[in-house]
Amino acid sequence: MYYVPEGKPLFRRQHRRSNPYRVFFLLTLIIGALFVYRGLATGEVVSPFEPTPTPTRVPASFVLQGQTLFEAGDLTGAIAAYQQAIALDPDNASLLAELARLQAYSSTLLTTDAQVLAALRQAKEYADQAIELAPDDSMVLAIKAFVYNWNANGSLVSEEERLALLSEAEQAVTRAIDLDSRNALALAYSAEILVDQQQVLDAEDRIRLALEADDSYMDVHRVNAYVQESLANYGEAIVEWQKAIELAPNLTFLHLRLGYNYRSLQMYDQALESFARAVEINKQLGIQDPVPYIAIAKTYAQQGEFFAASWNIQTALEYDPANPDLYGVAGDIFYRARNYESAMEAFHCAVRGCDADASCELRQCDQEVDLPVTVEGLPLTEGSKWYYLEYGQVLAALHRNASPTCPEAMDIFREFRRTFPDDELAISIVSAGEAICERFGY
């Protein structure tokens, strides 16, 4: 038997009377929910469960990143960081000037004239943009002078353009010093310009002023090393390169320049140590740069250790297999080792270019694994003229009636005479090669 409370209906719903306060509360909740839903749909209200938006980076953070990468020796990464900073702050002349300086430094890590010129031209564009924004800033003017001076490279530009660039560099650095006579970088860059104007004694006085103003800049010691090199004071230059390295220990081009000075003094072990340090820095950064291996290869070749030289140039070719300059270096090593057949093949790739099969054979690559690489030959310039000369000499020496190579040799010699008619030493070498081919009726 079930107990049923009195008045409790069992088989129908009980209708309660409405509570006005309860109804008002529910309506308020519904209306509020509608507003929230609408806000979420239009983006006016953000859900607490949405991921937090990534904060926007400010230019200063990219500058700090660039400085850190520069100190680590990663010039490419530093340049990219400064470019990002400038994208956020395009009217900052100081950033553009610093980017111009980094871009100029990066040219020291390139091997062909075309690559170097392109890097320096880009640096010049950045310097020009900086000057437009701050025409009376001493540091911006100093960096413009530095960049213009590096662009005034006789191996890369005509004599007329070289003199014009030097003149503008001189004007910029003079103005920089007028604005701030204690600007150590301006004084150092002025000394560098004076060396390039063949005013070495004046350059020595100017770099002394830079050292007195502030010797904490890497560039002040770099330029002093350059001044000492121009005076053939290689021992003093080595000391200055070492000081520059103390201030910027991971810049590979400083280690390379130190090594070149050791090599000039035939201090080959010390030279190789400097070049090996550049290799080590690049490995730490994950950079595959052929330049230190070229320096090592040339050093071994000077010592007559051609096997070690060949091994290092092969490594360089692995890193940059389409670079014709590297085939020229390989040809020079084969030439010194009196391996004339291999020298001829390598020089052909450097001067005339070669197909994928020829480049693969020289690189000793695996055709089943390595990508095919064709090589475009170098034009005849100041930077490539010795490859042309040696190639012509090898062609003349290897001429046989059954395998005639003098026709190509004579083409090389004619091209050389047209391009460098006033280079007496080179023309004398050309004449010797022509004499060989003339005996065969060419």
Whereabouts are the PLM-identified features?
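Structural marker of alpha-solenoid helical repeat scaffolds
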Residues: L88, L133, L179, A213-D214, ...
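Canonical tetratricopeptide repeat
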Residues: E98, I143, Y189, V223, ...
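Helix-start (N-cap) detector for alpha-helical repeat units in TPR-like alpha-solenoids
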Residues: P59-A60, A93-S94, S138-A142, A184-L185, ...
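Residue-level recognition of tetratricopeptide repeat
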Residues: Q67, R101, Y105-T108, F146, ...
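Alpha-helical segment of the N-proximal tetratricopeptide repeat
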Residues: R57-L88, Y105-V116, L185, Y189, ...
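Register position in tetratricopeptide repeats
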Residues: E71, Y105-S106, W150-N151, D196, ...
